[in-house]
Amino acid sequence: MQSPQPEKSKPPVKMEQRGRILGIGGIFFKSANRDQMREWYSKHLGLADKGYGAMLPWREHDDPQKEHVTVWTVFPASTNYFPATQPFMVNYIVDDLDALLDRLKQEGVKIDAKRMNEAYGRFAWIYDLDGNKIELWQPAKP
């Protein structure tokens, strides 16, 4: 006789707060040998960066109809896109950039004044306690 298996429980359904992280939108790092580094990652790990990064698609767990992409790319060591002292930067996909920035401001998080609007979405940047720059991306509506 088998012992009964516990039922998998799900957390109670609650109203989700807007301005939350949905997933990782990008991993960016610097290299003094950008082209060779791209070739190495393509050859050995299959991350083929053809100029705009390797695109790694995924779907939301709670809404599989919503597809996103995580971008992996190598920047030149001289890039000003993120601070010289920072060898990498993580981009997080968010559901509501304005709501998140409003909440982070109230919580005293350091927020970069720069904003960027592109055809593929809106961007903002914040800093963690160690001063690491973090990119926030709200994708454009399809």
Where in this protein do the model-derived segments appear?
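Vicinal oxygen chelate
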Residues: 2-32, 77-142
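A short, acidic/glycine-rich surface segment
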Residues: 11-12, 75-78
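Short, acidic/polar N-cap/turn motifs at the starts of alpha helices
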Residues: 53-55, 89, 114, 123
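Membrane-topology and secretion signals of cell-surface/extracellular proteins
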Residues: 47-50, 83, 141
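Short secondary-structure boundary/capping segments
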Residues: 62-64, 79-82, 115
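Core segments of cupin and vicinal oxygen chelate
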Residues: 18-22, 28-72, 106
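Residue-level signal for short segments within beta-strands and strand-turn junctions
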Residues: 60, 76, 138-140
